[in-house]
């Protein structure tokens, strides 16, 4: 967990809050999603979208991207200083899909960033509402996590494709703040640090001068974020060592890769939040629902209730399976890309299948795809039960480092037993004595060797009926746990490459 003095709930991070009580947090998170909803309604009016077109997830993504681009200070500044052909630094836009004469048409729109900022601020009582922007970023990140497997990125930084369950949030922009840092997996943080160290190795001036000082501060901050995700003293001590290094180089890279491997068993704590597309919040606000007054939480029943009665549509390519498209978005909405498939299936009430068995590509439609053959269908985003999102890695007891599930980073706080084949993971540690030998390494390896998969993780925690808003009667599911239900393993999902 984060070091004692700095513990703030995820909702507080989400809303830049000082210490708030539960009611205030619910109100400020409600205010945040309400603002996104109001902004979306206004954009749909501007673009003259019909109700159906406004509920099309592809239109939602374009509008969300426009507002993120309008507020991306650093990129805007960069674009103004380095003008590139055919790109107006003051404008933003994207494809909007409309139904014309029984066919879907693509229309490219262009807006002044200033205008988008004005509409966003107006929807948020004049504030910049950065929390709302971060919320949208996390929704995009969760969608990417569900759609793409980051094998190539892992291999590029010297990590192993088997570490894909550590990669939550790997596509989040750097400006995503505390709320963004909370949802990043151990592997994501390790990768960011390795990239930084590699730049330092290749560029002599990276750590020098006024800029170098800022770089150093950023490096130490990232180290501290990663340290805060680890739950054992030895892993944290190793992070201190990486952070305090005078001149970070290959030894630190090896240490970080070692730590990432160790996190497959000694799981880090990573937050999970249900962030929904703007086209879900919009219609709810339009129907008169007052999020701020009612209060809202990203980790409780609220997103489930919202998805239960929302209608979201998606464009479907000729050979895609609409049910599979629905699964992709359901997983993204519930931040469940790295959860055990059996558990997701139980909560959803329909079978959730691995990525490689889905007949669907991502949600976005490329500009060169033919629109003539596009159909649209309803996304089925409802669930049978609801469950509380967790931020623990599912290790059962921190004192005697127990084993977390290996190819899983749990999303829901629900009891499951831990099938896992430790030998495959321990094999990753033999024969690589790279980097320093240290007491900490020995200690971590010892903990991993001794880590017993306890019988169950999240003991006694269950799912709840959707009518059980107070979470009074947990239903503890039972699974056939003979094999582990990983979404990505043994699989050939598309790669994410910007």
Swiss-Prot record:
Keyword RNA-binding attached: yes
GO biological process, one term: viral penetration into host nucleus
Any one GO molecular-function label of the UniProt entry: RNA binding
Motif Bipartite nuclear localization signal, residue numbers: 198-216
Domain of life, source organism: Viruses
Spans annotated as Disordered: 1-21
GO cellular component terms, A-Z: helical viral capsid; host cell; host cell nucleus; ribonucleoprotein complex; viral nucleocapsid
Subcellular localization, as worded in the UniProt entry: Virion; Host nucleus
InterPro entries assigned to the protein according to its UniProt record, in alphabetical order: Flu_NP
Effect upon mutating residue 101 to N: In strain: A/Fort Monmouth/1/1947-MA
Principal location: virion
Ranges of compositional bias, category Basic and acidic residues: 8-21
Short sequence motif Unconventional nuclear localization signal: positions: 1-18
Keywords from the named record: Capsid protein, Helical capsid protein, Host nucleus, Host-virus interaction, Ribonucleoprotein, RNA-binding, Viral nucleoprotein, Viral penetration into host nucleus, Virion, Virus entry into host cell
Pfam family of the protein (one): Flu_NP
Description of post-translational modifications: Late in virus-infected cells, may be cleaved from a 56-kDa protein to a 53-kDa protein by a cellular caspase. This cleavage might be a marker for the onset of apoptosis in infected cells or have a specific function in virus host interaction.
HAMAP family, per the entry: INFV_NCAP
Self-association and partners: Homomultimerizes to form the nucleocapsid. May bind host exportin-1/XPO1. Binds to viral genomic RNA. Protein-RNA contacts are mediated by a combination of electrostatic interactions between positively charged residues and the phosphate backbone and planar interactions between aromatic side chains and bases.
Function: Encapsidates the negative strand viral RNA, protecting it from nucleases. The encapsidated genomic RNA is termed the ribonucleoprotein (RNP) and serves as template for transcription and replication. The RNP needs to be localized in the host nucleus to start an infectious cycle, but is too large to diffuse through the nuclear pore complex. NP comprises at least 2 nuclear localization signals that are responsible for the active RNP import into the nucleus through cellular importin alpha/beta pathway.
Membership in a protein family: Belongs to the influenza viruses nucleoprotein family.
The protein's name in its UniProt record: Nucleoprotein
Organism this protein belongs to: Influenza A virus (strain A/Fort Monmouth/1/1947 H1N1)
């Amino acid at each position: 967990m984060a070091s004692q003095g700095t513990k703030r709930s995820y909702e507080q991070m989400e809303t830049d809050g000082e210490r708030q009580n539960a009611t205030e947090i619910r109100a400020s998170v409600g205010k945040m999603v309400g603002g996104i909803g109001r902004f979306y309604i206004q954009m749909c009016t501007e673009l003259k979208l019909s109700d159906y077109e406004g509920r099309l997830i592809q239109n939602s993504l374009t509008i969300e991207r426009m507002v993120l681009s309008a507020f991306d200070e650093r990129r805007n500044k960069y674009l103004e200083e380095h003008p590139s052909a055919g790109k107006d630094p003051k404008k933003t836009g994207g494809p909007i899909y409309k139904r014309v004469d029984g066919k879907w048409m693509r229309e490219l729109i262009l807006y002044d960033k200033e205008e988008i900022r004005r509409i966003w601020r107006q929807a948020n009582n004049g504030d910049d509402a950065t929390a709302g922007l971060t919320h949208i970023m996390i929704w995009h990140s969760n969608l990417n996590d569900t759609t793409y497997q980051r094998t190539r990125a892992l291999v590029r930084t010297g990590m192993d494709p088997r570490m894909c369950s550590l990669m939550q949030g790997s596509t989040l922009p750097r400006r995503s703040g505390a709320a963004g840092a909370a949802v990043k997996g151990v592997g994501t943080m390790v990768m960011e640090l390795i990239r930084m160290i590699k730049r330092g190795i290749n560029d002599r001036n990276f750590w020098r001068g006024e800029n170098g000082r800022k770089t150093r501060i950023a490096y130490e901050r990232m180290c501290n974020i990663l340290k805060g995700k680890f739950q054992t003293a030895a892993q944290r001590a190793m992070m201190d060592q990486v952070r305090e290094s005078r001149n970070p180089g290959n030894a630190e890279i090896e240490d970080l890769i070692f730590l990432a491997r160790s996190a497959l068993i000694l799981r880090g704590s990573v937050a999970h939040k249900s962030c929904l597309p703007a086209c879900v919040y919009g219609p709810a606000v339009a129907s008169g629902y007052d999020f701020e007054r009612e209060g809202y939480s990203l980790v409780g029943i609220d997103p489930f209730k919202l998805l239960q009665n929302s209608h979201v549509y998606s464009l479907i390519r000729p050979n895609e399976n609409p049910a599979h498209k629905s699964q992709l978005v359901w997983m993204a909405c519930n931040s469940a890309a790295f959860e055990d498939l059996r558990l997701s299936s139980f909560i959803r009430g329909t079978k959730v299948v691995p990525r490689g068995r889905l007949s669907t590509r991502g949600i976005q439609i490329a500009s060169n795809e033919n629109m003539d053959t596009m159909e649209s269908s309803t996304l089925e985003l409802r669930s049978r039960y609801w469950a509380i999102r967790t931020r623990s890695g599912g290790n059962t007891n921190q004192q005697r480092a127990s084993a977390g599930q290996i190819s899983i980073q749990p999303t829901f706080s629900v009891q499951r037993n831990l099938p896992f084949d430790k030998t495959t993971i321990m094999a990753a540690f033999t024969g690589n004595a790279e980097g320093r030998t240290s007491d900490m390494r020995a200690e971590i390896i010892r903990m991993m060797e001794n880590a017993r998969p306890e019988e169950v993780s999240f003991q006694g925690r269950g799912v709840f009926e959707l009518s059980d808003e107070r979470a009074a009667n947990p239903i503890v599911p039972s699974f056939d746990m003979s094999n582990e239900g990983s979404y990505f393993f043994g699989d050939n999902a598309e790669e994410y490459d910007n």
